[in-house]
Swiss-Prot record:
An example Gene Ontology CC term for this record: cytosol
Species of the source: Rhizobium etli (strain ATCC 51251 / DSM 11541 / JCM 21823 / NBRC 15573 / CFN 42)
UniProt feature coiled coil, ranges: none
Keyword Cytoplasm: yes
Subcellular location: Cytoplasm
Signal peptide, first to last residue: none
Major localization class: cytoplasm
Record keywords, A-Z: Chemotaxis, Cytoplasm
CDD domains (UniProt xref): CheW
Domain CheW-like residues, every copy: 12-152
SUPFAM superfamilies noted in UniProt: CheW-like
Xref: InterPro entries: CheW, CheW-like_dom_sf, CheW-lke_dom
Protein name: Probable chemotaxis protein CheW
Domain of life, per lineage: Bacteria
Amino acid sequence: MSYAVKSLNQGDRELIAFRIGDQEFCVNIMSVREIRGWTPATAMPHSPAYMLGVINLRGAVLPIIDLAARLGMKPADPTARHVIIVAQVRRKVVGLLVDAVSDILTVTDEIIQPTPEISSDLERQFARGILAIDKRMICLIELEALFSETESEAA
């Protein structure tokens, strides 16, 4: 039995797209470890407002980040419909709370457009670019930019 393996062309990259509110974002799929359903987190004292707390992921403590709040959007009110994207950020693994995962995209660097100058400083800080695919506008998030070196070490 043979399995078809899709290989990427030189310059292609795979991204995982997800929704937060009415907006669509994406991250490099190579950073994503797994996608799991929402699990209530245990709050941690003196943590940033965007950190919901921690969960037990197969014996490991996983910090859960409200990605909406971290991006300067209205904080999420997690429900069973939300999902956690477990991702590698620098040398740490974190959980990113999003509304839903929508797609896996294969794109070339040429379709990634620069973030407009009129965007907020916060948006430009985290956004690597914008993808216009069909009638969708998808913001490419740079996960490493979400956390300073010290925050990443603390996570």
